[in-house]
UniProtKB/Swiss-Prot annotation:
One of its GO terms (molecular function) is peptidyl-dipeptidase activity. It comes from the Eukaryota. Homodimer. Interacts with the catalytically active form of TMPRSS2. Interacts with SLC6A19; this interaction is essential for expression and function of SLC6A19 in intestine. Interacts with ITGA5:ITGB1. Probably interacts (via endocytic sorting signal motif) with AP2M1; the interaction is inhibited by phosphorylation of Tyr-781. Interacts (via PDZ-binding motif) with NHERF1 (via PDZ domains); the interaction may enhance ACE2 membrane residence. Its main location: membrane. The gene is ACE2. A motif (Endocytic sorting signal) lies at residues 781-784. Chloride binds at residues 169, 477, 481. PROSITE patterns: COLLECTRIN_LIKE, PEPTIDASE_M2, ZINC_PROTEASE. This is Angiotensin-converting enzyme 2. Residues 762-805 are cytoplasmic. It is an enzyme of class 3 (hydrolase).
Length: 805
């Protein structure tokens, strides 16, 4: 037989083998899909029950259902790895196997997997049940929602905002710190066992595509694209930042630096994530009708159900389906009126088996009106890709899922749409001033959050990669916050805090870069859909409601789920394969032009050195080596604790003796910042149990003067080696080390020896005087002539004749 025949036969055998493998894989996946649907549903339902009723019983049921699902998935993942991907040509089968071959947390040992699950549950519970108490009324302890969020959204009281901001982080962040350290270690171990560099790399894997014809995309490319688009957005953000800073100076005179960063607790919510609630303070043309329709909603007696019904109408108007009957029956759209503890953070749920729900403690505000559109956008995506196999029921990437609802929010927020649904009066007319008002409100929500999102995820990526040691987490967090976002901490935070975890998404193990990518995608989608809807005019005035053509195009993309690369899905709608920030910049172009004119005489950018507490801070310099030489000790956390305690003691003494007040200052009331390795730092003092009540620097200086010697003695230093800059030295004597027992014994012994020597010397002198006196009377050796070589018998060589001590 010829060689070509054998080659053909081998190829046929190989093709048959591949065909057999592919058919077996299809059969395996069909069986998996059937079983996974039920087990996943039971796990999701138990999780829903826990999130809407936080009890020990429900967490136990959630853990049990989750364990069953995890065990099943682990087993199926191992089986999936027996099907070589190289032998699979059907892309739908191949993408399912690729997904299932990722083992997730099941690669961990049983003990570690259980510990990780315990940590995640604990972090979620701490976040959902944490409270902060009003220092002026300690019995008033508030949950985040409702309670603390109301303060952070509405209060203009600097100090009230500060105690709420700090109280949340001290109560929640500090509890989460040790858990988050374990979480990072375990998640990294899981990611590396799944062949990723670290957990951040694992998250970025959601964007990775192995495809042909230019549709491939790498994890490293995501980092490059995010950084590149951020440099393009930054000029717009810097001008928005400068404008907001000038307006905050009007509201909080003397509290804001005209060239510095913005205090983190003044930015509209608990995290400074969205600046939406700053609109009343920053509205450019206040005489114009208010485009925040919250008051109109209240006056028209809107409630949560009406809000979601209006959102549903919007989606239906573009040809997308109604919500299911089960959605309306099973969703939690308001906070329960009973005593149940719930997770209020808005989330959309695809439990499986056609069961779609939203969980949200809705309030009658324009912000929640837009949030309802966002969450319902998730549900529309879930319903659209329900036609896909179980493993492909997901967004093309995580950013796509977040973007869908935001597309609708862009249209729903326009004055034209608000007039259509009766929230703006029919007589409302748009002009250049109302246009700027509208765009500024949009920018506070959309542009203001981008650096926040970018910086948070950049910090987490660096933490997972090991580029920030845990001993420097908070130090680096606030360095990056100041440098990238232009936001400064209102009080310094040490390494006992975990400020990132005070945000829902961090405490609950969500990737966060999705909120950055979604913002880029949503404007790309909006521009494309507006073009399909035949919109004419500026992009920011486009309302795609009632455009069935736009809805049809969107639905085609939603139905794909994860069956195709996201690059292909993006191209299907917008005509390009990559993120492009140009539509976003085009949307805000009129505002950017206006902001540059407004900021013409203002400083644009921020000085990262300024701190809100700088005026009341005292700088300390410590010179251990020069003072103690080889006996110098190491300055560490324990020494800093002693310093803070010493200052607290000085404050107690001062208030007791000078002001006749008994105030229980403790070390936590002494706030240290700007610690340098050569031992210098700043500190200030707040009242006991009230971080917003800063003790005037002058009183702290008086307290230090009163107790200066005690403080010096605690560290074996003096005024020259323990310097409080700006406080005159007390001229107290240099430190005298305490006398120890062995020195006393040594002194006594040496004293006895010296006395003995003195006595011997005295007695020797007396004897010589007697001998000299005798020789002067008669010299027995006077006849000896030494010049003739005669020996003097009075000179003895023997040692025993010498006087000894």
């Amino acid at each position: 037989m010829s060689g070509s025949f054998w080659l053909l036969l081998s190829f046929a055998a190989l093709t048959a083998a591949q065909s057999t493998t592919e058919e077996l894989a299809k059969t395996f996946l069909e069986k998996f899909n059937h079983e996974a649907e039920e087990l996943s549903y039971q796990s999701s339902l138990a999780s829903w029950n826990y999130n809407t009723n936080i009890t020990d019983e429900n967490v136990q049921k959630m853990n049990e259902a989750g364990a069953k699902w995890s065990a099943f998935y682990e087993e199926q993942s191992k089986l999936a790895k027996t099907y070589p991907l190289a032998e699979i040509h059907n892309t739908t089968v191949k993408r399912q196997l690729q997904a299932l071959q990722q083992s997730g947390s099941s690669v961990l040992s049983a003990d570690k997997s259980q510990r990780l699950n315990t940590i995640l549950n604990a972090m979620s519970t701490i976040y959902s049940t944490g409270k902060a108490c009003n220092p002026n009324n300690p019995q008033e302890c508030l949950l985040l929602e409702p309670g603390l969020d109301d303060i952070m959204e509405n209060s203009k009281d600097y100090n009230e905002r500060l105690w709420a901001w700090e109280g949340w982080r001290a109560e929640v962040g500090k509890q989460l710190r040790p858990l988050y350290e374990e979480y990072v270690a375990l998640k990294n171990e899981m990611a590396r066992a799944n062949n990723y560099e670290d957990y951040g790399d694992y998250w970025r894997g959601d964007y990775e595509e192995e495809w042909t014809d230019g549709y491939n995309y790498s994890r490293s490319q995501l980092i490059k694209d995010v950084e590149h688009t951020f440099t393009q957005i930054k000029p717009l953000y810097q001008h928005l930042h400068a404008y907001v800073r000038a307006k905050l100076m009007d509201t909080y005179p003397s509290r804001i630096s005209p060239t510095g960063c913005l205090p983190a607790h003044l930015l509209g919510d608990m995290w400074g994530r969205f600046w939406t609630n700053l609109y009343p303070l920053t509205v450019p043309f206040g005489q114009k009708p208010n485009i925040d329709v919250t008051d109109a909603m209240v006056n028209q007696s809107w409630d949560a159900r009406r809000i979601f019904k209006e959102a549903e109408k919007f989606f239906v108007s573009v040809g997308l389906p109604n919500m299911t009957q089960g959605f309306w029956e099973n969703s939690m759209l308001t906070e329960p009126g009973d005593s149940r503890k719930v997770v209020c953070h808005p989330t959309a749920w695809d439990l499986g088996k056609g069961d779609f729900r939203i969980k949200m403690c809705t309030k009658v505000t324009m912000d929640d009106f837009l949030t309802a559109h966002h969450e319902m956008g998730h549900i529309q995506y879930d319903m659209a890709y329900a036609v896909q196999p179980f493993l492909l029921r997901n967004g093309a990437n995580e950013g796509f899922h977040e973007a869908v609802g935001e597309i609708m929010s862009l249209s729903a927020a326009t004055p034209n749409h608000l007039k259509t649904i009766g929230l703006l009066s029919p007589g409302f007319s748009e002009d250049s001033e109302t246009e700027i008002n509208f765009l500024l409100k949009q920018a506070l929500t959309i542009v203001g959050t981008l650096p926040f999102t970018y910086m948070l995820e950049k910090w987490r990526w660096m933490v997972f990669k090991g580029e920030i040691p845990k001993e420097q987490w908070m130090q680096k967090w606030w360095e990056m916050k100041r440098e990238i976002v232009g936001v400064v901490e209102p009080v310094p935070h040490d390494e006992t805090y975990c400020d990132p975890a005070s945000l829902f998404h961090v405490a609950n193990d969500y990737s966060f870069i999705r909120y950055y990518t979604r913002t880029i995608y949503q404007f790309q989608f909006q521009e494309a859909l507006c073009r399909i809807a035949k919109h004419e005019g500026p992009l920011h005035k486009c309302d795609i409601s009632n455009s069935s053509e736009a809805g049809k195009k969107l639905l085609q993309m939603l139905t794909l789920g994860k069956s195709k690369p996201w690059t292909l899905a993006l191209e299907h709608v917008v005509g390009e394969k990559k993120m492009n920030v140009t539509p976003l910049l085009k949307y805000f172009e009129p505002l950017f032009t206006w902001l540059k004119e407004q900021n013409r005489n203002s400083f644009v950018g921020w000085n990262t050195d300024w701190r809100p507490y700088a005026d009341q801070s005292i700088k300390v310099r410590i010179s251990l080596k020069s003072a103690l030489g080889d006996e110098a000790y190491e300055w560490n956390d324990n020494e800093m604790y002693l310093f803070r305690s010493s200052v607290a003691y000085a404050m107690r003494e001062y208030f007791s003796k000078v002001k006749n007040q008994t105030i229980p200052f403790v070390e936590d009331n002494v706030w240290v910042s700007n610690l340098k390795p050569r031992i210098s730092f700043n500190f200030f003092v707040t009242a006991s149990k009230n971080v917003s009540d800063v003790i005037p620097r002058s009183e702290v200086e008086e307290a230090i003067r009163m107790s200066r010697s005690r403080i010096n003695d605690a560290f074996r230093l003096d005024d020259n080696s323990l310097e409080f800059l700006g406080i005159q030295p007390t001229l107290s004597p240099p430190y005298q080390p305490p006398v120890t027992i062995w020195l006393i014994v040594f002194g006594v012994v040496m004293g006895v020896v010296v006395v003995g020597i003195v006595l011997l010397i005295v007695s020797g002198i007396r004897n010589r005087r007697k001998n000299n006196q005798a020789r002067s009377e008669e010299n027995p050796y006077a006849s000896v002539d030494l010049s003739k070589g005669e020996n003097n018998p009075g000179f003895q060589h023997a040692d025993d004749v010498q006087t000894s001590f």
